[in-house]
Amino acid sequence: MVILSHHKRSPPLLMRLFRICRFFRRLMSSSTSSVESVEDESCSNECSASFTFDTNNNSRGNNQVNELAEETHMKLSITPTRESFSLSQLERIITIGKGTFGRVELARDKITGAHYALKVLNIRRVVDMRQTQHVHNEKRVLLQLKHPFIVKMYASEKDSNHLYMIMEFVPGGEMFSYLRASRSFSNSMARFYASEIVCALEYIHSLGIVYRDLKPENLMLSKEGHIKMADFGFAKELRDRTYTICGTPDYLAPESLARTGHNKGVDWWALGILIYEMMVGKPPFRGKTTSEIYDAIIEHKLKFPRSFNLAAKDLVKKLLEVDRTQRIGCMKNGTQDVKDHKWFEKVNWDDTLHLRVEPPIVPTLYHPGDTGNFDDYEEDTTGGPLCSQRDRDLFAEW
């Protein structure tokens, strides 16, 4: 049994017009060219366009798949960044994200003025959706991870009905929004983002953690335009393989569908899907229904447009190798094989890791708490269903 959640965005027309005006005003004042003008050049020579897109149309439905069976909890060492956070010192401003059993709000520290993303989860809904273990896993994993391309988590709180995760506010919004607005990215743009993702995956895998939910919706842009991987609800520490199906249908690896067990290879498969989607504007395996998407993945009918860069095509084919033992990134040299691929030959990996490469997109921001790059949501005035003491006990150590 699986859960399919559908997420559609549709902000008011005035907000869309406002964002379009911001886009053209900022673009006209920039001396750099637009995103479509970026050609196959070295990452260090990327043109930088500063803008805000309309982030709301043509969503692919965001089908999220997660098997109901709970997974075995794997303990991780936890070193909280800050233990002095409390909800009382945060002013909750506006909702910037919404999910099946929770939402994300922009919050401001009343003392320092700093802005944070506050993830609010309704305990009853988490339990009803049988996501208890995934929520615990996300907290434990995020508190362990410290990397420039991964969103930071600072602390957690709870009250009688909700769980809270105090996280880094990433003001650029989702990569998904920019990709849908521009329809596709140039070869060099896709390579820039892929190189930062490779660094993040290398780090995660070195800790024995599999991400399992790589997709444009989970990739945020920092104020400078660098990648920030978010939403680690499906992340898991693995010693061998796991058998739970989780992720987005378009991005599921064949071994996940076959239930033969999967490991970090699913992240490399997802990277292949992501590179293809960035350059084409849609994932390679498509269908009108989830079943049709699964059939396309299993049949592995991989087609490329004629304009697809040959080196990128070669890498995508190797990332989308059905035999996971032969998939690039999964063999003896691991991530190094990916980094040594000819598509990345112009990438200076040290410069990439240390944020010395200029991003091709710099989000438009007018002040530190600017939420113009996010969708608009109705505020929750009810707080959601009340939970029982039995539900609360599941999060006694939160």
UniProtKB/Swiss-Prot annotation:
Residues of the Protein kinase domain: 90-344
Single Gene Ontology MF annotation: protein serine kinase activity
Catalytic activity reported: L-seryl-[protein] + ATP = O-phospho-L-seryl-[protein] + ADP + H(+); L-threonyl-[protein] + ATP = O-phospho-L-threonyl-[protein] + ADP + H(+)
Residues binding ATP, per UniProt: 96-104, 119
Pfam families the UniProt entry points to: Pkinase
Cited Gene3D superfamilies: Phosphorylase Kinase, domain 1, Transferase(Phosphotransferase) domain 1
PROSITE patterns: AGC_KINASE_CTER (PS51285), PROTEIN_KINASE_ATP (PS00107), PROTEIN_KINASE_DOM (PS50011), PROTEIN_KINASE_ST (PS00108)
Domain AGC-kinase C-terminal residue range list: 345-398
UniProtKB keywords: ATP-binding, cAMP, Kinase, Nucleotide-binding, Serine/threonine-protein kinase, Transferase
GO biological process, one term: cell adhesion
Gene Ontology CC: one annotated term: cytosol
Family indicated by similarity: Belongs to the protein kinase superfamily. Ser/Thr protein kinase family. cAMP subfamily.
PANTHER family: CAMP-DEPENDENT PROTEIN KINASE CATALYTIC SUBUNIT PRKX (PTHR24353:SF37), CYCLIC NUCLEOTIDE-DEPENDENT PROTEIN KINASE (PTHR24353)
Protein name in the entry: cAMP-dependent protein kinase, catalytic subunit-like
Native organism taxonomy: Eukaryota, Metazoa, Ecdysozoa, Nematoda, Chromadorea
